[in-house]
């Protein structure tokens, strides 16, 4: 009897082809975004340097954030590490949202959109891996 329940549960957790395609599209879009954003932080693009000056933690924080974003982007593209990458970037986006609201001002909408995208990927990939 427990074998039938296990089989039924694994069938429910198995993603449909359409869901898998949507998740991969979200992962690729997010990875491209974070490669660009993280790369610009690591390269020291002037607006990034200025933004991190305004944050006030020092430029080491720009390198850390850029490194986390590029690492997360890479992890999003490797099937066995997608969940880790998406979770890492979700936490990073929480920090970005709070920073925009408390320190930087301006619109946190891009960070919120990325948070929702990555939260969706994290949720479904976690459900699939159970």
What are these regions (language model features)?
Residues 1-36, 80-130:
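Extended, low-polarity transmembrane helix blocks
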Residues 8, 74-75:
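Acidic/proline-rich low-complexity IDRs
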Residues 14-65:
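N-terminal first-folded block
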């Amino acid at each position: 009897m427990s074998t039938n329940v296990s089989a039924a549960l694994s069938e429910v957790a198995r993603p449909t082809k359409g869901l898998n395609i949507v998740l991969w599209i979200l992962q690729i879009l997010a990875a491209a975004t974070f490669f660009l954003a993280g790369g610009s932080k690591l390269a020291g693009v002037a607006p990034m340097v200025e933004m991190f000056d305004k944050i006030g933690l020092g430029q080491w924080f720009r390198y850390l954030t850029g490194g986390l974003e590029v690492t997360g982007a890479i992890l999003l593209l490797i099937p066995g590490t997608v969940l880790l990458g998406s979770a890492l970037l979700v936490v990073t986006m929480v920090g970005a949202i709070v920073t925009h609201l408390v320190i930087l001002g301006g619109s946190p909408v891009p960070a919120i959109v990325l948070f929702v995208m990555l939260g969706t990927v994290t949720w479904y990939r976690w459900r699939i891996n159970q």
